[in-house]
Amino acid sequence: MAELFWFEKYRPRSFDEVVDLEEVKARLREFVKAGNMPHLLFYGPPGTGKTTMALVLARELYGEYWRENTLELNASDERGINVIRERVKEFARTAPVGKAPFKLVILDEADNMTSDAQQALRRIMEIYAQNTRFILLANYVSRIIDPIISRCAVFRFSPMPRSLMAERLKFIAKNEGVELREDAINMIYELSEGDMRKAINLLQVAAATNKVVDANAVASAAIAVRPADIIELFNLAISGDFVKAREKLRELMYLKGIAGADFIRAFQRELIRMPIDDDIKAEIAELLADVDYRLTQGADEEIQLTYLLTKLGAIGRRVKPATTQPRKK
């Protein structure tokens, strides 16, 4: 049997196993205790536990019969609101298994539905409200129409704090017989931006070929720019050594496969920590934003990043700042 993705293998199965979201858990526990609940809307960035919490709630409500009483749908995968309507109708027409008073429909990516489709969904929610509850999952609550929001208890899911992510990653690494270095945790957190699913996937990919996972292993797994490489590139460019800076850029692009957007994200992360004046940081941040915009419009990556290096060189000639040093591991 193929090995499970670690994200699925270590997905919490109960409220007690969820390491964050204390306020959300407290309110959902009250619903379980009462044996009843309204429709729910979970919103927040990817990887913040929305699907996990919905499945945990199903397990807590229904126990051994949670699969029979739960229907999972994805608004992006389904072929339109008519398919969703028919599947919900088929699911809701039978009584819940066990002593549950209602069945549960989990609809992921609800914010990807058009306004017309959401209006139709609202009517579906009303028609089957007697014996069915909906949990809608969305990245952006602003994309959900007000008539649906008004019919739901709304819960916000935030990116996991670094301390809790580190704790979870260490737990998984220990269980899998992997030595996880602190610099690897730092890089995983920065690259995942609080997305726990992405963080665990990065750890698994890095651990596939390394029993000791450090920042270099994570960078290789993610095809990401190491902080030391960004610092070196910045120092070469701002000191006016354009030839060496361009050589370093091409090495990272064509030998290590780093994409233009990844360069910009890495520069932005490191810029905050660089020991240079705030007005220079602001100027560089504006430059990064300009280059990032042109990349999103389809401009050539090498040309745009080379332009970035020349502009950094011009800033360096004007202000002559001291070079910055790589962060200590």
Swiss-Prot record:
Quote the cellular component terms of the Gene Ontology held in the record. Answer: DNA replication factor C complex
| Annotated residues for binding of ATP | 44-51
Q: Which Pfam families match?
A: AAA, RCF1-5-like_lid, Rep_fac_C
Q: Which biological process, per GO, is one annotated for this protein?
A: DNA repair
InterPro entries named in the record? AAA+_ATPase, ATPase_AAA_core, DNA_pol3_clamp-load_cplx_C, DNA_Rep/Repair_Clamp_Loader, P-loop_NTPase, Rep_factor-C_ssu_arc, Rep_factorC_C, RFC_lid
GO molecular function (one): ATP hydrolysis activity
| UniProt entry keywords in alphabetical sequence | ATP-binding, DNA replication, Nucleotide-binding
Q: Which NCBIfam families match?
A: PRK00440.1
Listed PANTHER family: REPLICATION FACTOR C / DNA POLYMERASE III GAMMA-TAU SUBUNIT, REPLICATION FACTOR C SUBUNIT 4
Concerning its family, UniProt says: Belongs to the activator 1 small subunits family. RfcS subfamily.
The function of this protein is: Part of the RFC clamp loader complex which loads the PCNA sliding clamp onto DNA.
* Description of how the protein assembles with itself and partners: Heteromultimer composed of small subunits (RfcS) and large subunits (RfcL).
What's the protein called, per UniProt?
Answer: Replication factor C small subunit 1
Species this protein is from = Pyrobaculum aerophilum (strain ATCC 51768 / DSM 7523 / JCM 9630 / CIP 104966 / NBRC 100827 / IM2)
The gene for this chain is: rfcS1
